[in-house]
Amino acid sequence: MLDVNVFDELRIGLATADDIRRWSKGEVKKPETINYRTLKPEKDGLFCERIFGPTRDWECACGKYKRVRYKGIICERCGVEVTKSKVRRERMGHIELAAPVTHIWYFKGVPSRLGYLLDLAPKDLDLIIYFGANIITSVDEEARHSDQTTLEAEMLLEKKDVEADAESDIAERAEKLEEDLAELEAAGAKADARRKVQAAADKEMQHIRERAQREIDRLDEVWQTFIKLAPKQMIRDEKLYDELIDRYEDYFTGGMGAESIEALIQNFDLDAEAEELRDIINNGKGQKKMRALKRLKVVAAFQRSGNDPAGMVLNAIPVIPPELRPMVQLDGGRFATSDLNDLYRRVINRNNRLKRMIELGAPEIIVNNEKRMLQESVDALFDNGRRGRPVTGPGNRPLKSLSDLLKGKQGRFRQNLLGKRVDYSGRSVIIVGPQLRLHECGLPKLMALELFKPFVMKRLVENEYAQNIKSAKRMVERQRPEVWDVLEEAISEHPVMLNRAPTLHRLGIQAFEPVLVEGKAIQLHPLACEAFNADFDGDQMAVHLPLSAEAQAEARVLMLASNNILSPASGKPLAMPRLDMVTGLYYLTLEKSSEEFGGQGAYQPADENGPEKGVYSSLAEAIMAYDRGVLGLQAPVRIRLNHLRPPAEVEAEQFPDGWNQGETWLAHTTLGRVMFNEILPWNYPYLEGVMVRKGGGSDKIMLGDVVNDLAAKYPMITVAQTMDKMKDAGFYWSTRSGVTIAMSDVLVLPNKEEMLDRYEESARQIEVKYNRGKLTGRERYDRLVELWKDATDEVGQAVEDLYPDDNPIPMIVKSGAAGNMRQIWTLAGMKGMVVNSKGDYITRPIKTSFREGLTVLEYFNNSHGSRKGLADTALRTADSGYLTRRLVDVAQDVIVRVEDCGTRQGVRVPVAAEVLDATGAVTGYTRHDLIETSVSGRVLAGDATNAAGEVVLAAGTDLTELNIDLLVEAGIKDVKVRSVLTCQTPTGVCAKCYGKSMASGQQVDIGEAVGIVAAQSIGEPGTQLTMRTFHQGGVGGDITGGLPRVQELFEARVPKNCAPIASVEGVIHLEDEGNFYTLTIVPDDGSDNVVYEKLSKRQGLASTRVAMESNAGAFIERTLTEGDRVTVGQRLLRGAADPHDVLEILGRRGVEQHLIDEVQAVYRAQGVAIHDKHIEIIIRQMLRRGTVIESGSTEFLPGSLVDLSEAKLANSEAIGAGGQPAELRSEIMGITKASLATESWLSAASFQETTRVLTDAAINKRSDKLIGLKENVIIGKLIPAGTGISRYRNISIKPTEAARNAAYSIPTYGESIYGDDGFGEFTGASVPLDEAF
């Protein structure tokens, strides 16, 4: 077998008939498969043992040689080599064809490579190949020229003979006519009878003349065709061709079918054709030039690659190994076989029949028909259904050809090469494991035993519980008690990987340390649910076992759940308390007033009745009061603390030099809040507020912000421990909070009817106006929708006011644990407006709440929207998965290759926003809204200087939160940062341009697969949001508008209702022309006016920002009008701009920024944070190539797409050699097109359009350098990312100078040398020798 680690490249080319015969171990001559009586393969058949190898290991077909000792011997009786049966997966055969056939990929593919090479239209090719017309393959012009006068004389002679024959025939007939007339006259016939005879004779003579003329015309046509005869000339008239062959076969050759195509290819001069085509390209224009360009691509491909074009016509076809097209016996004695066997049998049957007919000397028409059938059967074998109706099997099912085995989701690439199944894995339902630590998972004992079976067996033998592996296996299978103890040892510190499908981002697989649990369900840590998007309603997860020490180390260091708290997309924590935990922490940190609580232990200020109460000397004293029932958890108290750090303002006031542990301070707080702060690290500032998951306020603290802050300031291990404590506290206190929901908790509005009656009256007035014709249908619809939305809002607000704070329903919402206020409105107020299947509102609202119950009509109306929601969700989930797949494909080879590419280029990003006072004057600066997603985690490309020109931060500085604050304080509005868009690394990106890894907060490591992380970061929220509509019960935001827009942007499509953009800066002049505007821009530089005609009024003019005269520094948004000024790139109509226009007008940087802004706008509208750098990676891949306009001295073909880094290299070489550089135009490619244009043919073929990619790659003899991840996964090599890159693989360990000196210095023997002898301390007991050493 081939070792994948031996080669560095994989090349694909065209196989010639000699190659096919060289691969083959023998010719398959019969269509038989196996003998149905003996069940042995037939000799010379499709499963022949002589060709493909024995069906049993080390045994020939006849049984003369058995056992491995005869290895390599070829049996003289049956001719089968004694070897392993595994060779039947590798050995190929071949079929010698009685007539050549063309390869359908090259003839029928788009564009037709054969057609371009021979300059024949696909229609004509089809006629030739399938015996519908003849083609001239060669003409002996010299012989024709030299013999032309002789041949012409012969032809004139023949014409004269025809004329003479006709004349004699006519004379003969005239003579006979005279005789007939004389006879009639003698017989006294009437004039009428004589006239008839005369007319008949005239007609006959006319026929003779016409026949003669036709014969002469025919001879003229034959002669004219012959003297103009040229190679590649098609002759559709069969009689004309036969005549030419009869008369002049010595002067030309021709024919029909693949033989003629083969002859044309053999006579084809590649170099001369390429030269001629280049000449046409340089001097021609229009269609002729375009055709020449397309043809030159194919001709140059053969010229450059050294492929023999004759390989496109086959004289022998390969037969793939029988184990890859198996035949298996079913229970009923029937056989199931691969479709390929049927297709091969058709080829062999037709081939044998053709051979027999040729031997018998059958008429040409029959032989040609048989050749055509052979061509069709080979077409069906290679690509069934590509031409004409597909060959079908039983039940009219099209048979799967060789192409179908490669194509699509079930094809070889995606099913078997990229989606292999693995052993040491299991799968089970998940349940919650609240007792687990963040890095642990509960593994069912039986599953663990099966997964760790080899490890357990080894330890059983090592610990002398079993004598050998066989008995150890028996012990494991019988589940002896000792086995469980050994299993505990085997699993300790051996992480397992858990995966939940769909794995939308890298946190869909994480490593955990297993803990054995009873039952059959896997227990998952509650905080890990968010990353896996898991819930416990029947979800299943798969377990995988990393086996080698390296795999275990990687799982522990890189994949352990406690090391993966942050999202790789935004750097925000994913392991966040949710649901019950949030309720518990909200309850714990809630504060209620003393009156409300009414306990003795609550804080009460001093008054005339006595000193202040509720002041505690320590936390222990407060807990004691709580345990005795004197103090409430949420009651306000004052506690003296010395083990928790005070809040920042208290620390600044009381401890100017900084607080040290042990120093006391007085906290105005509640007991619950102190308990919560005990969870946090001791030196974390005290948090005084109520903990919520979302919807912050004055005294509310967002749990996300806390976890974010912890992740930024503390090591991951501390964060993980804190999260675990939060989880425990959350569950503990949510149990004690007694938050439950009963029907009695859903309060109903007492005055809802009166409220709605008012709106009902207004709705009636609208209907009356509509019926009287005062309103159009659209106005009526808009007014009713507006009216009932107001009604829903009013009722909803009243419901909110009705609920007391301690009601569990608003408590769940206010804490951010689940749901939103709108759902409470639906539950207790009214559902409001619902949509129909088209997405329009139904103008009758649902006035009842779920508590009251819907009427039949309301339920029916509601079902439209619900059904639409579910259908949309299902469709968009598939869309989103496909988007992710395309993104991964386009970015999979973007890996961090080097530390620093050394570029000084970068992009400008906003840092600070001005703070204006009422007069519009700048009073200070604040952080820009987009800092988190654009600036954070980058490296400065240039010095950041303030207004005075002083350097605040030097180039190369990492932009941490601290550094960003420095920039904001210095009033620096924007800075130039390093970006992957400007990275100069030829393949992949450099660490400096990428910046920090969002998942770790540290500089990205070399070898990190940042392309795939980027694709996952963009694709995962798309899917999450589409799915989340189902969880929300149809309420709230939805990505409907968003996902198609993201696809449109990444595919670089022209948007629907595309808006034109200004190509120059100037003043606009508008002309109204009915349904359209004509807009003219008068440029500032005095150049020619730019006119935009037929701008749709319906689409509407775009809005523009105009400075307010009354308020300096303030702007208003309004529609463009006459005399407005527009800048370059500004949109003129409402709608999205075409990225291709943006590239043309604003250049590369303009389109980059446009795409980032547009994609981010979609995600921000959904509340999803994705760092710009991920989108930049995809955009970099979209803008990687350019079109060659002038090739200069380089080898590029004009009109071809070239990688810009390659072009740069070729240009510098051309200039160095004193030549002309190539001229290129930047192109923006959609992600699908960019994926297919990749250098790696393996990656492109496994993505889409497999046959087209392989056809193209074979003609160009493409070599895959195995740079990306996908191609290495396909061939089974270690991927070139992470620890798989060469700089980590090829490490040789050498001692340092100091170590070398120490090793070769003269040793001195101290007492320690006589210490440990391996026998341990003296005990008096004998020690077994094998234990001692």
UniProtKB/Swiss-Prot annotation:
Mg(2+) binds at D535, D537, D539. Keywords: DNA-directed RNA polymerase, Magnesium, Metal-binding, Nucleotidyltransferase, Transcription, Transferase, Zinc. InterPro entries: DNA-dir_RpoC_beta_prime, DNA-dir_RpoC_beta_prime_bact, RNA_pol_asu, RNA_pol_N, RNA_pol_Rpb1_1, RNA_pol_Rpb1_3, RNA_pol_Rpb1_3_sf, RNA_pol_Rpb1_5. SUPFAM superfamilies: beta and beta-prime subunits of DNA dependent RNA-polymerase. GO terms for molecular function: DNA binding; DNA-directed RNA polymerase activity; magnesium ion binding; zinc ion binding. GO terms for cellular component: DNA-directed RNA polymerase complex. It catalyses: RNA(n) + a ribonucleoside 5'-triphosphate = RNA(n+1) + diphosphate. It is an enzyme of class 2 (transferase). Gene3D superfamilies: 1.10.132.30, 1.10.150.390, 1.10.1790.20, 1.10.40.90, 2.40.40.20, 2.40.50.100, RNA polymerase II, clamp domain (4.10.860.120), RNA polymerase Rpb1, domain 3 (1.10.274.100). Binds 1 Mg(2+) ion per subunit. Binds 2 Zn(2+) ions per subunit. Zn(2+) 2 binds at C901, C983, C990, C993. Its EC number is 2.7.7.6. GO terms for biological process: DNA-templated transcription. Zn(2+) 1 binds at C60, C62, C75, C78. CDD domains: RNAP_beta'_C, RNAP_beta'_N. The keyword Zinc applies. Its cofactor is Mg(2+); Zn(2+). The keyword Membrane does not apply. The RNAP catalytic core consists of 2 alpha, 1 beta, 1 beta' and 1 omega subunit. When a sigma factor is associated with the core the holoenzyme is formed, which can initiate transcription. Belongs to the RNA polymerase beta' chain family. PANTHER family: DNA-DIRECTED RNA POLYMERASE (PTHR19376), DNA-DIRECTED RNA POLYMERASE SUBUNIT BETA (PTHR19376:SF54). DNA-dependent RNA polymerase catalyzes the transcription of DNA into RNA using the four ribonucleoside triphosphates as substrates. This is DNA-directed RNA polymerase subunit beta'. It comes from Corynebacterium glutamicum (strain ATCC 13032 / DSM 20300 / JCM 1318 / BCRC 11384 / CCUG 27702 / LMG 3730 / NBRC 12168 / NCIMB 10025 / NRRL B-2784 / 534).
